[in-house]
């Protein structure tokens, strides 16, 4: 089934087209495409609010219940580990299960377990509390993986020629979820206690379920012949996976560490700690649609966005503390400024990765359809989860051992290495293409001369 409103059928993203065609197609949205956007926006907003609500107050609450910083980091990190495993499964079987059913069921379970997280303060402290935190987070991770994998597949199917633009535009709602989650959670916690933030957000997500059941179109496709293994063993995809890992680990690193650092360093109340996260989320939400549009309109600039975005991110983490060897005094305004720059650099790096992987898959013989879109969506979600597991787990451990300043600098090394590796790959790829073009130019010149000789005689 071709994308609605696209008579030419799906084509690899980033293909040539008339100037302004991407913008024109987005103006001529069919009803189904409009409903897809609403559904994807709802899952982005709801899931990111549920994910980010923990930041301002949960680490402090967990400490009261007997959890160490390392355990708190693992509670954040286990979410990503099980999202990784679930994304690989759901991405491979999205055609068999059905994208719409996977989407709706994922949202329903996510809303329910968010409410369950709100009653964990009634659980006895110590091992029982820690075990229940892990159990509820794992259930939430699996449901979130189902909804997001299905959402990305449906979006790429509905908008085959504007993947980066649409994904980038919908990051507004992811950013809005990240923006609203911490301050809403912090102020509800400060005003009404531990339970209400989770119950409120869980109910909001559950209210979105019947809406999506009614409006989300049902896409069907035949199962494909390719596998995750073939996709991830492509050299370019392997490096893009490393980029995704590094960026998600940078975000995940901040979850268990930044709120504790701000509380200790600047003595802010829990409600205001959430506002510190605002700079990162707001700049990411605003910049992502712009980088998405740029990626679709000028596909050749994606490589530079990826490389420079990673290098800027590395610099941000060196200055986040800042690292002691720079002898720069830590100040709240500087921290917020660095988070704003990090949000922009993250948008530069994250948005081009999905269309780059999809283009690479098409170039290497993967069929165009929901099956390949499911593989790419599942791979993206799974590899994001790898970094999101390592980031908070390693971040919590390093924070405990060497402090936030050095831990952030070490985290920045990952982004630096991935940016340099991606840049080196693109340079080598460009030189290989130039060498390949030269013999073809020589052959075509000789053929032209041969064709002209009889006429000259």
Q: Residue ranges of each PLM-predicted region?
A:
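Extracytoplasmic gate region of multi-pass secondary transporters
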Residues: 54-56, 238-277
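Residue-level signature of mid-helix packing/kink "hotspots" within the transmembrane helices
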Residues: 80-88, 178-179, 281-285, 289, ...
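Conserved MFS/SLC helix-loop-helix module at the cytosolic interface between two early adjacent transmembrane helices
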Residues: 85-124
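Helix-to-loop junctions at the C-terminal end of transmembrane segments
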Residues: 86-98, 189, 288-300
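C-terminal ends and interior cores of transmembrane alpha-helices
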Residues: 108-126, 311-329
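Hydrophobic core of transmembrane alpha-helices in multi-pass small-molecule transporters
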Residues: 128-146, 331-349
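Cytoplasmic helix-loop-helix junction between adjacent transmembrane helices
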Residues: 134-174
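C-terminal membrane-cytosol helix-exit motif in multi-pass small-molecule transporters
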Residues: 202-221, 421-426
